[in-house]
Amino acid sequence: MNKAILAVAMVLLLAGCATKPEEIGRAPDLSPVAAHLGMQNNPQFNGYPARPGKASYSLWDQRSTNFFKDPRAATPGDVLTVIISINDRANLDNKTDRERVSKGIYGGGGSFATSSITGAAAGGDMDASINTHSDSKSKGKGTIERSEDIRLQIAAIVTDTLPNGNLIIRGSQEVRVNNELRVLNVAGVVRPRDISGNNTISYDKIAEARISYGGRGRLSEIQQPPYGQQILDQFSPF
């Protein structure tokens, strides 16, 4: 019995730790290159043609840039630059005031008379009434103020082509500074005609855009409560 209690206590103690045991005393590891692209299981990448070799006795090297080819990304494996410039501000103020009062009186009356065995008459009146009253009030007020200013550039790679010609792109960037890892991810669907001549595209032209900017490390861990406290906050009724 004591061993079971000790085991449960150790599990709760480890659950309350904010830092993973394997990351104690060391900086977060960087993800492998192309780990977010799934290149191993993507047939588009596996079937991507290799660059041709240099032809013998030829003045033109096929490995050089083609002067007549569009430099914009168009096929899986091509790279383009995503420009993220978000300056979003929102102010929302909601207020509700509801009041409901209802009253009701329900009543009835009647008279009756009886004769006793001795012949004396007995009579009486009956009056029954029910009073109801209900009062309900509710007030609510909510205010939201949000301000976001993000200006970044990230290179993304074309991972797939849709049947209508649109491109699926995905990009990831990781920068580690002083044991803090900053991670930027972007993904979405773009139209080839929205890609500019310098092979860049703005974030607002990406459909189904998924943009995340965060980090891992000591600073990020301090800003959030430990796992154990999060579990208690989730299930505690108080």
Swiss-Prot record:
- Lipid-bearing positions (S-diacylglycerol cysteine): C17
| Example of a GO cellular component annotation carried by this entry | cell outer membrane
- Molecular function as annotated in GO: cytoskeletal motor activity
Q: Which UniProt keywords apply?
A: Bacterial flagellum, Cell outer membrane, Lipoprotein, Membrane, Palmitate, Signal
Q: Which InterPro entries match?
A: Flag_Lring
The yes or no answer to whether the keyword Signal is present is yes
Cysteine disulfide partners in this protein? none
PROSITE patterns tied to this protein: PROKAR_LIPOPROTEIN
The protein depicted here goes by the name Flagellar L-ring protein
State the NCBIfam families in the record: PRK00249.1-5 (NF001305)
Q: Where is the signal peptide?
A: 1-16
Stated role: Assembles around the rod to form the L-ring and probably protects the motor/basal body from shearing forces during rotation.
Q: Where is the lipid attached (N-palmitoyl cysteine)?
A: C17
Primary localization class, coarse: membrane
Quaternary structure?
The basal body constitutes a major portion of the flagellar organelle and consists of four rings (L,P,S, and M) mounted on a central rod.
Compartments, record wording: Cell outer membrane; Bacterial flagellum basal body
Q: Which domain of life is it from?
A: Bacteria
Q: How is this protein positioned relative to the membrane?
A: Lipid-anchor
Task: Please name the GO terms of the biological process aspect recorded for this protein, alphabetically.
Answer: bacterial-type flagellum-dependent cell motility
Indicate the family of this protein: Belongs to the FlgH family.
